[in-house]
Amino acid sequence: MVIIADSGGSKIDWRLLKKDGTIGQASSSGFNPYYQPIDHLKKIISEALLPQVSERVSKIFYYGTGVSSDKNVQSIQSVFAEHFPQAESEVGWDLLAAARALCGHEPGIACILGTGSNSCLYDGEKITGNVANLGWILADEGSGTYLGKQLIFDYFRKEMPESLAKQFHARFPWSREEVLEKVYQQEKPGAFLASFAKFIFQHLKEPYCYKLAYKGLSDFFENNVMKYENYKNLKVHFTGSIGFYFSDVLRQVANDKGITVKNILEGPIAGLTLYHQKDL
C-alpha cells in the first residue's frame, strides 16, 4: 500500500493506493509544524488514517505546508516511522505536490492560486526555479487575498460602482473599524480577505468585478509566470480555488499574453494519486 497526504493548514486529504488497484480515502484536520505540536499529527494518524489501513504500507508521500526546514521534515518522518516502521517516507512542500499533480513527468510551470499564490519551474522530475514568495502583505498576486484586498480597498474608498456597493453592504454590513480589526488584530487575516473572492466570482458579469479579477490574474502572470525563462514555450498549469473558479478569466489573460494554459485543478490530490500509481 502507498499512502499519499496533501496537507494544508485546515485539512489533510489522504489517499491509500492498494495492491488490488482500489483507492481508499480519508480526511482529517490540517497540520502545520510551525504552528502545531508534532503530537497533533500523531493524533491525526491514529484517529483518521490507521482505521483505513488494511495492508502493509511500503511508501508514504506527504506534501504540506511548513516543511521548508530539515527539522520539520525529520519530525514528520519520525512520526510515520513510529506507525509504519517498514515504510519509506518522503516529505515535500505543497509546490512539489502541485508540480507533480499538474505536470506529471513533463516539464512545465506549475502554479498555486488559492488563498495565497506561488509558482515554480519544473523539469519533469524536480523543481528547478521558484519566483520568491513574499506572502500576502507584499505579494501573492492573483490570490484570493490579493483580490479581496482590492475589493475592500475599492469599497471603502468608494471606487466600487454604487449598485454593487449596496449589494456588498447588504451581505457584509461591517464598518471600516470592524474590517480593520479583522485584518490587523485577529488571526488569519489573509483567509479573511480571501473570503471576499466569492463575491467577486458571483458578480463576474459586472464589468467592475471582471476587470478586478482580470487585473489581479494579469499581475500574477507578469510577476510570476513571465519571470521564468522560455515561459512562452512551456505549458502553464494551475491548482487552487481561484485558478479553478476563475478559470475562464485566467485563460483569457493567458491568451492575451500569448501563454499556453493546460491543466487547471481545484486541488492536487487526484493528480498525485495518478502520479504515484508507479510506486505501488
Where are these regions (language model features)?
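Polybasic, low-complexity association/targeting segments
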Residues: 61-68
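Phosphate-binding/catalytic loop of phosphoryl-transfer enzymes
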Residues: 68-163
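Cofactor-binding loop segments of dinucleotide-utilizing enzymes, especially the Rossmann-like FAD-
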Residues: 65, 94, 241
